[in-house]
């Protein structure tokens, strides 16, 4: 599995602001979008381009355009919605595919409760977004679902990742790419990433 920890100073600065205990909902939400945008920039650096000729202000001019790669952004409900706009800033034509997961209280396994995927997802690059990669269970289940629907090209963007989640994701899906703003220290006994961001969903949506 390709693993990229984006160490750009802007990413580190903005993530540091998100870690503050007193960060407001508005600021956290804005920062999630901004860091998502910066991660998208890194994750799409290998998109193939082609030369096309257009009519410029002074006549015909050759320009580069993305070559034939259709994209769908896949936010995992609900926290993933907080990063979605950051992807769409760069790829406004991307289709949106939504996956909802909940954790079974007895088995502790993720269970999909909602999905609405692009009808031609097998032809698209899927960019899956979720702020946290903790145990990796929800992400693995989401990628399982995408592959079942025929999706072959998958990249994952997360704000923070725990080593435990990275290991689990690599074991389950070694063919995907993972981009994160930070590889944090560990998971605590309650499954929270340390130092992490706390409950990213609550902070994005202003709920407790």
Swiss-Prot record:
**Entry EC number(s):** 2.4.2.9
Under the heading Gene3D superfamilies, the entry gives:
3.40.50.2020
Listed Pfam families: UPRTase
| Annotated metabolic or biological route of this protein | Pyrimidine metabolism; UMP biosynthesis via salvage pathway; UMP from uracil: step 1/1
Cofactor(s) the protein needs = Mg(2+)
- EC category name: transferase
> What are the protein's UniProt keywords?
Allosteric enzyme, Glycosyltransferase, GTP-binding, Magnesium, Nucleotide-binding, Transferase
Q: Which reaction does it catalyse?
A: UMP + diphosphate = 5-phospho-alpha-D-ribose 1-diphosphate + uracil
Q: What is this protein called?
A: Uracil phosphoribosyltransferase
* Upper taxonomic lineage: Bacteria, Pseudomonadati, Pseudomonadota, Gammaproteobacteria, Pasteurellales
């Amino acid at each position: 599995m390709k693993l990229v920890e984006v160490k750009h100073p802007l990413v580190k600065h903005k993530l540091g602001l998100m870690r503050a205990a007193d960060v407001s909902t508005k600021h956290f939400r804005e920062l999630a979008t901004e860091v998502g945008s910066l991660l998208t920039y890194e994750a799409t650096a290998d998109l193939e381009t082609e030369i096309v000729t257009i009519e410029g202000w002074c006549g015909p001019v050759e320009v580069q355009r993305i070559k034939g790669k259709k994209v769908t952004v896949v936010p995992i409900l609900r926290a993933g919605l907080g990063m979605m706009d950051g992807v769409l800033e760069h790829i406004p034509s991307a289709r949106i595919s939504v996956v909802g997961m909940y954790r079974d209280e007895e088995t502790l396994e993720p269970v999909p409760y909602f999905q609405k995927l692009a009808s031609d997802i097998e032809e698209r690059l899927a960019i899956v977004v979720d702020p946290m990669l903790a145990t990796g269970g929800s992400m693995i289940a989401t990628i399982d679902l995408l592959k079942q629907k025929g999706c072959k090209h998958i990249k994952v963007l997360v704000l923070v990742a725990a080593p435990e989640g990275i290991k689990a994701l690599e074991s389950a899906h070694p063919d995907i790419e993972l981009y994160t703003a930070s590889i944090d220290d560990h998971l605590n006994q309650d499954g929270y990433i340390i130092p992490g961001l706390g409950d990213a969903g609550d902070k994005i949506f202003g709920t407790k």
